[in-house]
Amino acid sequence: MNTKFSLQYGYTLFLLFFLPQHCIAASEENTDKYIEKYPYVYHLVQKELWDKALEDNSTYFPPTYSQDKFTHATANPDFLLTIGNHFYTQVKGEWRCLRMSVDSLSATGVKTIFEGTAPVGDKEADFEGTDSELFPHILGGIHPSAVLQVHMVSRDSEGRFLSVSDVVNTD
């Protein structure tokens, strides 16, 4: 293959990928506004995996962490059911929702940044509302001491997420 063509093609793809419409990142000012509006960070977790982290008092890492390089979360609780139903309906078992804050995560040495949506593993984040929302990306795992509250998650027999107790429901 022609090296000049290969480099030119690579640069073109790089430039297309980083067009402004493909990049939503939060400035420190925007992050502060987001945290003021949404003071908590929520993460949906398989109960079995969370129970293991609690039992061992160890840091939990989601199954896609090695691929994604961060732990997915949302600050806007209105997205919890959409996220669950988009990414996790095929994952069997009970689920929980962890409520944290940027400060509680920081106290365990974990930084949180607010960015545009990103795929979870191989599943694209192409659900409605993702083009204008910033999502907290937790740059590490979640230690039990960072969690302020654990919420029950209700699902139906098809795996659809119906509610997160004391946070959001489908009604």
Language-model regions: role of each:
Residues 28-171:
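Conserved, structured core segments of small domains
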